[in-house]
Amino acid sequence: MIIWLSNFLEQYFPFFRLFEYLSFRAILSIITALTISLWMGPKLIAWLQNLQIGQVVRDDGPESHFSKRGTPTMGGIMILTAITVTVFLWADLTNPYVWAVMFVLLGYGAVGFVDDYRKVVRKNTDGLIARWKYFWQSSIALVVAFALYAYGKDTAATQLVVPFFKEVMPQLGLAYILLTYFVIVGTSNAVNLTDGLDGLAIMPTVFVAAGFAFIAWATGNVQFANYLHIPHIPLASELVVVCAAIVGAGFGFLWFNTYPAQVFMGDVGSLALGGALGTIAVLVRQEFLLVIMGGVFVVETLSVILQVGSYKLRGQRIFRMAPIHHHYELKGWPEPRVIVRFWIISMLLVLIALATLKVR
């Protein structure tokens, strides 16, 4: 929104030309989202406490988690508010890619809100019935997938980028819709599964968003896109502002979510952030890099799949408890140790993924 105003004012006040620079708006995006989160946090936490909207803890979970009962949840409202306000302030709202990410972010946020609300009101861990959650996740993802395919059909926006091979970028055709669907839904649920310890999900989300900010900038810059042998998609550059908003909001939320947490993001936050990251990965054509950058999310999800599969097929569990962060807790690792080590792994994976852009 500000960029529209600056286009008008710059003819009278040259200073406003600064707002045309993507880097300047990205910095302002981080600062704005961070400020909103820090300002909103205490108010939201107090409001949630007054409404007795507290975390419901599974009886079969680690004993160390029983003390978390009653801690305010649905803190993702803070994250989504900060991102939404920031994007509407600093992003170019004529860019359809911005709207695609925001549609998924807010749509999945609404699904997560209903899920959290039902958990809190009914005081159990069931929440929204699984088939309805999956239905709404699928519906939102398919709407975006079909819209993006119709908009970018047979262009660089629908090519498959294969790591390590600079000339291998086949057109996906209708398979683009299927890939987009699985990436968005899968990433959303993966982040949701990871959100089980204080600050565990938010920092990997921040790292991945920061990585995608660089990729979005490179993808939108014709010189760098050619240099790195990745598709040049001009619209992708504006996603830098969106990624910056996620980074700023994430740091602001971490201020209150760090161990011991004052608030949890809940499904309203984790489903939305995961869906947004998946959408960004699709838009910049780096689905494979998402698997590397989001390796923590991938491993958490695989641990659940392997645990369930092993128990049903062999009657035996592979891990003491899934997702895998609970396995390490039950092995005796203090919660902060699990969290920080997962953060370190996540940061390294993002750096490795970025390095692969040059290894072609």
Swiss-Prot record:
This is Phospho-N-acetylmuramoyl-pentapeptide-transferase. GO terms for molecular function: metal ion binding; phospho-N-acetylmuramoyl-pentapeptide-transferase activity; UDP-N-acetylmuramoyl-L-alanyl-D-glutamyl-meso-2,6-diaminopimelyl-D-alanyl-D-alanine:undecaprenyl-phosphate transferase activity. Its EC number is 2.7.8.13. The gene is mraY. PANTHER family: PHOSPHO-N-ACETYLMURAMOYL-PENTAPEPTIDE-TRANSFERASE, PHOSPHO-N-ACETYLMURAMOYL-PENTAPEPTIDE-TRANSFERASE HOMOLOG. GO terms for biological process: cell division; cell wall organization; peptidoglycan biosynthetic process; regulation of cell shape. InterPro entries: Glycosyl_transferase_4, PNAcMuramoyl-5peptid_Trfase, PNAcMuramoyl-5peptid_Trfase_CS. GO terms for cellular component: plasma membrane. The chain crosses the membrane at residues 27-47, 73-93, 94-114, 132-152, 168-188, 199-219, 236-256, 263-283, 288-308, 338-358. Catalyzes the initial step of the lipid cycle reactions in the biosynthesis of the cell wall peptidoglycan: transfers peptidoglycan precursor phospho-MurNAc-pentapeptide from UDP-MurNAc-pentapeptide onto the lipid carrier undecaprenyl phosphate, yielding undecaprenyl-pyrophosphoryl-MurNAc-pentapeptide, known as lipid I. The lineage of its organism: Bacteria, Pseudomonadati, Pseudomonadota, Gammaproteobacteria, Vibrionales.
